[in-house]
């Protein structure tokens, strides 16, 4: 137990407009007990820890998921300290409310401005909560798909009441944060890499 190697913990910030279902998504992903009768209160700030199976030989990776207060009205920017520490961002919107998608463009611009030249994965989740009124939802989701393609970010359709819909976005994100170590086929390079790892230990 003392010799167990502790892997890097990926820090993921979940953000978006107030009332789009960020907390319900996280609670369902981590605990799996959210249903339409579950009472959730507006979030100030919460932290969840999830152990994620990325499907790579049974190895589990750890995500620390930060749930933030929803943005609304005049406050359409994330506080600056939220932009400094995350390794990845999950942007959530409700396709029934086009304003929630518009707000994500501002959040993404802030992330780009403060990322300090490092590659930070960003994922967009459409939290489809109601099956009624497909036309407005489809128009908003078409806009979201076009925007995500232009920004080169992944766009997923999920439902906070359906836990399996949340697996793919978070396992993919976790795999990007914890890439597999590749072994070189060149013996000389492999020897250099092994020597470097020994000197770092």
UniProtKB/Swiss-Prot annotation:
Extent of motif Effector region: 40-48
Binding-site list for GTP: 16-23, 67-71, 127-130
GO biological process, one term: negative regulation of canonical NF-kappaB signal transduction
CDD domains in alphabetical order: Ras_like_GTPase (cd00882)
Matching InterPro entries: KBRS (IPR042227), P-loop_NTPase (IPR027417), Small_GTPase (IPR001806)
Subunit structure as annotated in this protein's UniProt entry: Interacts with NF-kappa-B inhibitor cactus.
Domain notes: In contrast to other members of the Ras family, the members of the KappaB-Ras subfamily do not contain the conserved Gly and Gln residues in positions 18 and 71, which are replaced by Lys and Leu residues, respectively, and are therefore similar to the constitutively active forms of oncogenic forms of Ras. This suggests that members of this family are clearly different from other small GTPases proteins.
General function of this protein: Atypical Ras-like protein that may act as a regulator of NF-kappa-B activity, possibly by preventing the degradation of NF-kappa-B inhibitor cactus.
Protein's name in the database: NF-kappa-B inhibitor-interacting Ras-like protein
């Amino acid at each position: 137990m003392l010799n167990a190697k502790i892997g890097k913990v990926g820090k993921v910030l979940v953000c978006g407009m107030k009332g789009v279902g960020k907390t319900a998504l996280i609670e369902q992903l981590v605990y799996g007990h959210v249903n339409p009768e579950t009472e959730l209160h507006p979030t100030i700030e919460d932290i969840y820890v999830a152990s994620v199976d990325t499907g790579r030989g049974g190895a589990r990776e750890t995500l620390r998921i930060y749930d933030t207060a929803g943005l609304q009205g005049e406050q359409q920017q994330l506080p600056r300290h939220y932009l400094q520490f995350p390794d990845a961002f999950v942007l959530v919107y409700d396709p029934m409310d086009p304003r929630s998608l518009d707000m994500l463009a501002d959040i993404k611009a802030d992330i780009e401005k403060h990322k300090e030249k490092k590659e930070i994965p960003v994922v967009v989740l459409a939290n489809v909560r109601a099956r009624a009124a497909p036309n407005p939802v489809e128009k908003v989701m078409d806009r979201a798909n076009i925007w995500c393609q232009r920004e080169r970010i992944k766009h997923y359709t999920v439902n906070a009441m359906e836990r399996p819909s949340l697996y793919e976005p978070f396992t993919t994100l976790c795999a990007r944060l914890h890439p597999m170590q590749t072994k070189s086929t060149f013996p000389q390079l492999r020897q250099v890499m092994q020597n470097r790892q020994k000197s770092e230990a």
